Amino acid sequence: MECVRSGALDLGRSGNFLGKSGSTTSCGKVRCSTNLAGSTKCEQNLHGKAKPLLLSASGKARGTSGLVHRSPVLKHQHHLSVRSTSTDVCTTFDEDVKGVSSHAVEEKVGVLLLNLGGPETLNDVQPFLFNLFADPDIIRLPRLFRFLQRPLAKLISTFRAPKSNEGYASIGGGSPLRKITDEQANALKVALKSKNLEADIYVGMRYWYPFTEEAIDQIKKDKITKLVVLPLYPQYSISTSGSSIRVLQNIVKEDPYFAGLPISIIESWYQREGYVKSMADLIEKELSVFSNPEEVMIFFSAHGVPLTYVKDAGDPYRDQMEDCIALIMEELKSRGTLNDHTLAYQSRVGPVQWLKPYTDEVLVELGQKGVKSLLAVPVSFVSEHIETLEEIDMEYRELALESGIENWGRVPALGCTSSFISDLADAVVEALPSASAMATRKVKDTDSDMDMMHYLTKMFLGSVLAFFLLLSPRLVSAFRNTLQ
């Protein structure tokens, strides 16, 4: 995700903060133009409450792929209803059925696309980074020390902005993520119409314009009566889909308009047949460019997360990523493509352990083993942004060539690929909430089972060390050198 290369985040607390390029409103985000109900309480009940519950679909609905599925659901502070619609598990908010009467009788379907966001100009980089690092789902501090989140986010973003500016300058001066996401939204609207579903499409970004709060405000103005929420992350992680969904939950539980609004959330969709086949199509196309396609190593590079997210917080991201790769390779094998493949994780920051193996280290190892042709596949991303255009296309390509790899290729992000957009439209249709009542699922608070003093000590010391080593790439390099 763009968080490592740039960074800015959810500013859930009330209070004003002045950034370099502007001020905040009570919604807490740098230069945010909205002031929505509930936005000043974004940091309540966050740490330890976002542990996902792994659910299995209870049945297979018409038109589904039948592929293996695991999908997480975040804990909701009030009543959270969960249902299975096809292979995707959808979360439905239905806290106050009396509120349904306040909505118009005429059905108006809305689809909310959630994404990371990215700075559109170099002046946006520092406040974007602030928003990123202020997110408690990006840098997880114990509740006791969460008052440090915003000051440290300011410190980190200020020190990291010059380096991030260089990266964005190298790809044209800003992130193309918003433009591409808008194009995907338009394409999805057309695809839904072709499937006889008229829907209004909204885009809500986590760390830059248009913020999720702005999209929610427009949904209210448009009097939407059914809403499908679709994070544009194939695999679920606490730090991506989870963070965006948490913001949405906080808004929903505080806003009377949403009390009776049926909302279905598609938490992950990497297992969908349309997505898997679309990825296989792109890989096959890029393999054909090589003079020796059968000898090319397929190199899946996924965005990494700290190992503690998986071990301590129960993030299903690693399991879902491995399942995703297995499904794509199974599809390629069925087409006669039998290339070797490997998976590595990119974009780690600081001295803490992230998911391994690391992309940069694996590239060097492959070169040493004599691999000559490599096709990089950015599997966490459906849009081009700084981690594909700068980190993979520039940094990793250069490293690969220096390591002895002679032929380099890269699969583009899915973007507006017609088969991919069509499958997203199918997912939306399948996820539309039903009118029937749903059973509430209780999510266990796993923090209560942990040794609290051990947990607080581990998280605090690790977070403080990570914060200071995040400040400068030179500090990170110096720290690593002392370990060698």
From Swiss-Prot:
One of its GO terms (biological process) is heme biosynthetic process. It is an enzyme of class 4 (lyase). This is Ferrochelatase-2, chloroplastic. It comes from Hordeum vulgare (Barley). Disulfide bonds: none annotated. Belongs to the ferrochelatase family. The lineage of its organism: Eukaryota, Viridiplantae, Streptophyta, Embryophyta, Tracheophyta. InterPro entries: Ferrochelatase, Ferrochelatase_AS, Ferrochelatase_C, Ferrochelatase_N. Catalyzes the ferrous insertion into protoporphyrin IX. GO terms for cellular component: chloroplast; mitochondrion. Pathway: Porphyrin-containing compound metabolism; protoheme biosynthesis; protoheme from protoporphyrin-IX: step 1/1. CDD domains: Ferrochelatase_C, Ferrochelatase_N. GO terms for molecular function: ferrochelatase activity. Its EC number is 4.98.1.1. The gene is HEMH. Keywords: Chloroplast, Heme biosynthesis, Iron, Lyase, Plastid, Porphyrin biosynthesis, Transit peptide. It is found in: Plastid, Chloroplast. It catalyses: heme b + 2 H(+) = protoporphyrin IX + Fe(2+).
